[in-house]
Regions:
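ATP-binding N-lobe of GHMP and related small-molecule kinases
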Residues: 6, 10, 17-113, 131, ...
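Short, conserved charged micro-motifs
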Residues: 41, 68, 276-282
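Solvent-exposed alpha-helices and their adjacent loops that cap or buttress functional pockets
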Residues: 50-51, 147-148, 154-157, 173-178, ...
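Glycine/serine-rich anion-binding loops at beta->alpha junctions
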Residues: 104-133, 151, 257-273
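Contiguous, small/hydrophobic- and glycine-enriched helical/loop subdomains that border
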Residues: 122, 126-163
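Conserved, helical-rich catalytic subdomain that frames metal- and/or nucleotide-binding sites
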Residues: 158, 163-259, 274-277, 284-287
């Protein structure tokens, strides 16, 4: 009998990974508050983030050199302006990788929708490069690198349910939110996050969401407590500019959602349902009405 501790596995050149596939999950904001505008132009936020089951798929392949991005989406750049490219370049430069990478993005998360589609693709790229080139980075390492790409990237590396503070980079993992069904709808408009924050006057926010109360409700596994505290101060800007968002929120409630909210800077709206069948019927109805 051999003790497991005495077994050593020697890595050979043939064992290196040449291809890797990873899913990049979208997020919604169960609650979003803007505390104040910072001197550097950013905003201090306090929000509860939640991963949802909508995801992009990224395929990685080793190459002799360079970074090549391809995608089935005709709406995204494939050059240095793409966050996937920026994340891959960051990893190559940081860890002195001498080879290149080809990355194919299968896009499912709506673009410019307030669901962190670009950020989660960047986070998946950090993870994918780590695995493909066997870099040995910890989750903490990747989260710290992610700050250099975007404020939501560290959260997207971590995923799950979390409290985000600072500019979104200070994260506190929370217990998983209670089981429920989430229906997501995006009107046929794109919203610039930059536009929303530029038009938000943080000093004029009269009612702030009860984020601390929501965190307590999550700890107590109280779905009703979470639903009662669902608020997003960015709605004051985005809904004013695009009234269709409020119409979708109201329609979701008419179709059985216990509550509905705009995610992030919008325009995506999500509704929370207790019963799967009701969520499915609401989906069918919204599809029929669009």
């Amino acid at each position: 009998c051999i003790k497991l501790s005495t077994i050593i596995v020697y890595k050979t050149e043939q064992s290196k990974m040449n291809e890797y596939r990873i899913k990049a999950y979208a997020k919604i904001n169960l609650g979003l508050d803007v505390v104040r505008r910072l001197e550097n132009g950013y905003h201090e936020v306090k929000m509860v983030m939640q991963t949802v089951g909508i995801y992009d798929v990224l395929d990685f392949q080793r190459t002799a050199g360079g970074i090549v991005i391809t995608t089935d989406s005709g709406e995204l750049p494939t050059n240095e302006d793409n966050l996937i490219y920026k994340a891959a370049k960051l990893m190559i430069e940081k860890y002195h990788i001498t080879e290149g990478v080809k990355i194919y993005l299968e896009k499912h998360i709506p673009i410019a929708a307030g669901m962190a589609g670009g950020s989660t693709d960047a986070a998946a790229t950090l993870k994918g490069m780590n695995r493909l080139f066997d870099l040995g980075c910890t989750l903490k390492d990747l989260m710290e690198l992610g700050v250099n790409i975007g404020a939501d990237v560290p959260y997207c590396v971590m995923g799950g349910t979390a409290l985000a503070e600072g500019i979104g980079e200070k994260l506190t993992p929370l217990a998983p939110a209670p089981d429920c069904y989430v229906l997501v709808a995006k009107p046929d408009i794109n919203v610039s996050t930059k536009y929303v924050y530029e038009h938000l006057d943080a000093q004029e926010i009269r009612k702030h969401p009860d984020i601390d109360g929501m965190v307590e409700a999550i700890a107590e596994e109280s779905l009703q407590g979470i639903l009662d505290r669902m608020e997003n101060v960015l709605e004051t800007v985005t809904v004013s500019a695009y009234p269709i968002i409020q119409k979708i929120k109201d329609r979701m409630k008419e179709l059985g959602a216990i509550n509905s909210l705009m995610s992030g800077s919008g325009p995506t709206v999500f509704g929370i349902f207790v019963e799967k069948d009701m969520a499915r019927r609401a989906y069918d109805k919204l599809e029929e009405e669009q």
